[in-house]
């Protein structure tokens, strides 16, 4: 493969694995900027609960693809893909090397494979109807009207089932067939972090976000956007919201957030094993190994 092709370095791993810190070190050594791939960090006003790179970290290295929209405006995969490609192309024009850092597997896969999702906006009333029907019947419906997409979706995956049905009823076509796929013109080096003490790191991260102002951040979001904001149902914010309502004491909120985060990390690792093929870095000295692998590819 021609070394003149641009190189995209992907640093992936489950939540709390240390991607942000290592990504910054790699960027500093190579003179790069970071393109964040996190489905919640694209939203403004959501810093603590999403473990967004701090202001100090952003001063050290410029980060792109964060704070793109207010949390009451949906960032679709199509929107993200389009914005990310422009951002990456700008970086590649300057250095011929781009650095992606994140744990949102579906976003990473779409971006690195060149798969562009259809630009069909979500339709709340239709989604409510599907929710009322229930996932089992929704999946059977999908198998009937769009068997091609159904084969790629787990029967329990209500989010992707709903989206596939939404696209089909809006266009009359399969979501799978509507997705345009054009392999991007770059080389790809995927590096992975999966520390053996991940559960301890998650527990510490959970303690930190509550101590550092998650409750206050959640109160701000409720005051600005209302209790019905969908993102308030995500990990951490949901527990903080229940605590604010007096439905959950602090210790239970921390416990539930920790539990849900570990479950999420497990799903992330399953995705990375099935959809990506990263070189898993030695946890004792990941920076040294990462730089060695990168220099071998660049040469």
Curated annotation (Swiss-Prot):
InterPro entries: Dimethylallyltransferase (IPR039657), IPT (IPR018022), P-loop_NTPase (IPR027417). Gene3D superfamilies: 1.10.20.140, P-loop containing nucleotide triphosphate hydrolases. It holds the Pfam family IPPT. It catalyses: adenosine(37) in tRNA + dimethylallyl diphosphate = N(6)-dimethylallyladenosine(37) in tRNA + diphosphate. Residues 38-41 are annotated as: Interaction with substrate tRNA. Keywords: ATP-binding, Magnesium, Nucleotide-binding, Transferase, tRNA processing. Its cofactor is Mg(2+). Its EC number is 2.5.1.75. Catalyzes the transfer of a dimethylallyl group onto the adenine at position 37 in tRNAs that read codons beginning with uridine, leading to the formation of N6-(dimethylallyl)adenosine (i(6)A). HAMAP family: IPP_trans. This is tRNA dimethylallyltransferase. It comes from Prochlorococcus marinus (strain MIT 9211). The gene is miaA.
